[in-house]
């Protein structure tokens, strides 16, 4: 049966509505979701250590009707650089925030991130912050130990633990009980070092079969994004390498040559490796003064130089020959390009105002430098903040503790300050290299470190049964950046 015309019209109209949508029944599209962006200007700022940057302007740009506030967090810079206002604040539309960065204790170039969050929304922007280290006419090398992991901080007689962990209250590193494999740790340590004037790390090294230091150096330290900010040299630890056997046999010489050939192939070619003169790679040779017989030392050095020449390098050897308890020996000194003394504490105990420690070094610095200069050998003065291994070597040794203060009432770091100002820097100024050596940046086992610690009140108490077996009644304090501040200040005031 044929439908009436009006029915066909109705069906046609409804069909068109189904195809095209009837205006009266469609829902409007949802409004755009409110959002925001972060804008940072300028793209880079700079200052130098001790200074403050020009302002960085941070703005919130609302989108699609966004009317909320944003929690803004600033990240990407190390300890020792301080934003103002603080690293977290509220940002609102129409009220840009000016940020400045002061740099009392860190240097380097960093990508600073400004991260904004509001509920589920998150956006960020960045600027480049460059903090230049202070001018430094000296080479300042500090012994650096890449051997820390969780076990290294725990007491194991002769090998593990720290004095600072046994003090009451404890005075641990500012970075905590860190792992040397952590790149953020290495970045922070480089930033602290170069800001204080340390422009060289002499890196403790023994073969991989002895300890995993080589892996940390090659795969962590030398891969760090900031390794170009500092130079490094190898610190050849003969004592650990050969188990404190100082009889220099032909087999040991062969092993030494092999080790240095490894240096030539894997380290000397690195752009940050310390070279002096006409591209001569520097190596510190630890415990050189203990090697015997002297004739074997002479032969070893001659053979070593020949092997390095064959490898394409005129090596610069700094021998550990300075011992203030022994007169200088020209026969020994003459083997090296320069001499230094890793362990200047030499068994002294107590405060330097009482024990003649600094007076001894004053006399022997003069004697050793004169003897070295007569042989055409440079003298690298060494300085230490103190020494105390009594919480680590509780059974295997009974070494005295050398205080970090000149007296109990003196300021924290006063011995280091006097050693550096009156001896190390003036003697370095009177040398060709103009170099000083610091024992150490981070040897926490022997408490020679100048790496920043947490800040605490002074104490003489420790966790030993007597309450002072480790401190020997000497004053210890969590010192923060005190030693790095002293170093930076004294370098700035020195006359090279």
Model-derived features: positions:
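Bacterial N-terminal signal peptides that target proteins for export
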Residues: 1-12
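Solvent-exposed, well-ordered amphipathic alpha-helical segments
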Residues: 3, 61, 71-75, 86, ...
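Intrinsic structural disorder/low-complexity segments
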Residues: 8-9, 100-101, 283
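Cysteine-centered motifs
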Residues: 14-17
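C-terminal motif of bacterial Sec signal peptides marking the signal peptidase cleavage site
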Residues: 19-21
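Glycine-centered flexibility motif
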Residues: 23-24, 50, 68, 104, ...
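Long beta-sheet-rich domains in secretory-pathway and surface-associated proteins
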Residues: 26-134
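Glycan-processing catalytic domains of CAZymes
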Residues: 133-496
């Amino acid at each position: 049966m044929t439908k009436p015309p009006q029915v066909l019209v109705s069906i046609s109209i409804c069909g068109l509505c189904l195809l095209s949508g009837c205006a009266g029944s469609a829902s409007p599209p949802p409004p755009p979701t409110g959002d925001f962006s972060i804008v940072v200007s300028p793209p880079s700022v700079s200052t130098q250590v001790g200074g403050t940057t020009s302002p960085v302007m941070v703005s919130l740009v609302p989108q699609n009707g966004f009317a909320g506030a944003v929690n803004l967090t600033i990240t990407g810079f190390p300890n020792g650089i301080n934003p103002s206002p603080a690293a977290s604040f509220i940002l609102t539309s129409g009220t840009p925030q000016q940020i400045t960065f002061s740099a009392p204790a860190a240097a380097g170039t960093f990508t600073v991130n400004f991260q904004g969050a509001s509920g589920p929304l998150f956006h960020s922007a960045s600027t480049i912050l460059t903090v230049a280290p202070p001018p430094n006419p000296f080479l300042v090398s500090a012994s650096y130990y890449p051997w820390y992991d969780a076990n290294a901080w725990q007491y194991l007689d002769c090998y593990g633990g720290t004095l600072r962990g046994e003090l009451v209250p404890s005075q641990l590193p500012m970075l905590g009980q860190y792992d040397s494999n952590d790149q953020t740790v290495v970045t922070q340590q480089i930033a602290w070092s170069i800001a204080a004037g340390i422009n060289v790390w002499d890196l403790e090294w023994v073969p991989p079969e002895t300890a995993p230091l080589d892996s940390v150096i090659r795969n962590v330290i030398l891969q760090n994004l900031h390794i170009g900010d500092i130079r490094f040299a190898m610190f050849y630890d003969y004592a650990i390498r050969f188990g404190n056997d100082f009889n220099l046999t032909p087999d040991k010489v062969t092993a030494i040559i092999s080790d240095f050939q490894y240096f030539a192939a894997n380290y000397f070619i690195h752009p940050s490796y310390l070279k002096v003169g006409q591209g001569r790679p520097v190596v510190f040779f630890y415990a050189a003064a203990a090697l015997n017989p002297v004739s074997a030392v002479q032969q070893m050095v001659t053979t070593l130089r020949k092997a390095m020449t064959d490898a394409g390098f005129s090596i610069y050897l700094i021998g550990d020959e300075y011992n203030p308890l022994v007169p200088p020996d020209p026969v020994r000194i003459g083997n090296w390009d320069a001499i230094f003394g890793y362990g200047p504490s030499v068994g002294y105990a107590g405060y330097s105002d009482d024990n003649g420690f600094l007076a001894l070094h004053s006399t022997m610095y003069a004697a050793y430098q004169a003897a070295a200069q007569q042989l055409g050998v440079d003298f690298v003065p060494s300085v230490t903040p103190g020494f105390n291994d009594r919480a680590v070597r509780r059974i295997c040794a009974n070494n005295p503790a050398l205080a970090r203060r000149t007296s109990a009432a003196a300021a924290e770091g006063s011995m280091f300050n006097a050693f550096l100002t009156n001896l190390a820097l003036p003697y370095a100024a009177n040398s060709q290299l103009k170099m000083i050596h610091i024992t150490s940046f981070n040897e926490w086992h022997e408490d020679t470190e100048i790496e920043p610690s947490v800040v605490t009140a002074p104490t003489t108490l420790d966790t030993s049964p007597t309450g002072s077996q480790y401190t020997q009644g000497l004053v210890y304090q969590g010192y923060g950046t005190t030693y790095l501040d002293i170093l930076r200040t004294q370098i700035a005031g020195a006359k090279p």
